[in-house]
Amino acid sequence: MTSVSLGMPAAPPPVLAPRRKTRQIKVGSVGVGSDSPISLQSMTTTPTTDINATLQQIAELTASGCDIVRVACPSADDAEALPIIAKKSQIPVIADIHFQPKYVFAAIEAGCAAVRVNPGNIRKFDDQIKEIAQAAKDHGTSIRIGVNAGSLDPRLMEKYGKATPEALVESAVWEASLFEEHDFHDFKISVKHNDPVVMVRAYELLAERGAWPLHLGVTEAGPAFQGTIKSATAFGALLSKGIGDTIRVSLSAPPVEEIKVGNQILQSLNLRPRKLEIVSCPSCGRAQVDVYTLAEEVTAGLEGMEIPLRVAVMGCVVNGPGEAREADLGVASGNGKGQIFVKGEVIKTVPESQIVETLIEEAMRIAEEYEEMGGEDGQGGIKGSPVVSVS
């Protein structure tokens, strides 16, 4: 397409800030920090003592794209379950430890890839950091120093009055210094708060204090809709500045939903290869079809598709043809029928009742061609087509 000059300087393409340089640690086989891809985490909701249920949930998370999984370990019975879970999990397992340092040692001995400790409720056992650091070194286990506004050290609450960004960072830096005193550096840090504004500022301050890998999270983010908004807002603000090495979306929802949201956040920022994307309009008085239903049915029909496919579902003749032409596959609807576009070309016109069926059939055909070719760009992707559009 020939560009048209309007006498204005061309804006550079949008890019994120350079990735913050950090140390790299390993959580099992997954690198965190430095040039490693930003990894995606979740946490099981099953009782850890129910080994089969926990492994089943881990398998579901793995299939959804989870890189690292955390399991709770509040009791001796949970600690006894860790060796089997750590051995049979397809992805690295982190044991989540509070109050009881003895479970830190148990998790390390069990073969967990990492252990999360909370300075807010384990700090009174700081005299055991030397032994924890040595055990972790001996077993190749990394540590997450996980500061949380809801369990901040009482001494810092008294000093600051509440869980301020400065309080969260002070807690994290103090604990980090103890591990570093014993020449242990294989740790990452999180400073979580339920307020995205406070959380973002805390991570900004922490990023200025050292080259530690950072685990991003908005704690207690809430139900699926609210938690998604909070996490997307906070992660977008930080990741666009190059801050963040691994993320966990916290939702009051099944863990697989956390992975779906996290994947979309990373894909939207081009921090993970884009897969299926559906672009749809919000609908208006011009729409001549039920855009909402079309978008939902197309999304459901293509769920699980792994190729980078852009599908456009458009509801009127204003933006419809243009959006459909820009997609790999699309429909511009109106007057009880839909024009089906593939790579910008109209290939057929179908009745409204056949739009969803036709789009799904064409998407499957494109997917088969993609698999046969190994990706049009030779690297598993369709050139210039990461999205599905519904308008």
UniProtKB/Swiss-Prot annotation:
Record keyword Metal-binding present: yes
Region Disordered: start-end pairs: 372-391
EC code: 1.17.7.3
Gene3D superfamilies hit by this protein: Dihydropteroate synthase-like, Sulfite Reductase Hemoprotein, domain 1
Keyword field: 4Fe-4S, Iron, Iron-sulfur, Isoprene biosynthesis, Metal-binding, Oxidoreductase
Keyword 4Fe-4S among record annotations: yes
Residues binding [4Fe-4S] cluster, per UniProt: C281, C284, C316, E323
Leading EC class: oxidoreductase
Co-factor requirement: [4Fe-4S] cluster
GO MF annotation terms: 4 iron, 4 sulfur cluster binding; 4-hydroxy-3-methylbut-2-en-1-yl diphosphate synthase activity (ferredoxin); 4-hydroxy-3-methylbut-2-enyl-diphosphate synthase activity (flavodoxin); iron ion binding
CC cofactor note: Binds 1 [4Fe-4S] cluster.
Pathway: Isoprenoid biosynthesis; isopentenyl diphosphate biosynthesis via DXP pathway; isopentenyl diphosphate from 1-deoxy-D-xylulose 5-phosphate: step 5/6
Chemical reaction(s) catalysed: (2E)-4-hydroxy-3-methylbut-2-enyl diphosphate + oxidized [flavodoxin] + H2O + 2 H(+) = 2-C-methyl-D-erythritol 2,4-cyclic diphosphate + reduced [flavodoxin]
GO biological process: isopentenyl diphosphate biosynthetic process, methylerythritol 4-phosphate pathway; terpenoid biosynthetic process
SUPFAM superfamilies membership: Dihydropteroate synthetase-like, Nitrite and sulphite reductase 4Fe-4S domain-like
Superkingdom as given in the UniProt entry: Bacteria
Function as written in the Swiss-Prot or TrEMBL entry: Converts 2C-methyl-D-erythritol 2,4-cyclodiphosphate (ME-2,4cPP) into 1-hydroxy-2-methyl-2-(E)-butenyl 4-diphosphate.
Protein family: Belongs to the IspG family.
UniProt-listed PANTHER family: 4-HYDROXY-3-METHYLBUT-2-EN-1-YL DIPHOSPHATE SYNTHASE, 4-HYDROXY-3-METHYLBUT-2-EN-1-YL DIPHOSPHATE SYNTHASE (FERREDOXIN), CHLOROPLASTIC
Annotated protein name in UniProt: 4-hydroxy-3-methylbut-2-en-1-yl diphosphate synthase (flavodoxin)
Species: Renibacterium salmoninarum (strain ATCC 33209 / DSM 20767 / JCM 11484 / NBRC 15589 / NCIMB 2235)
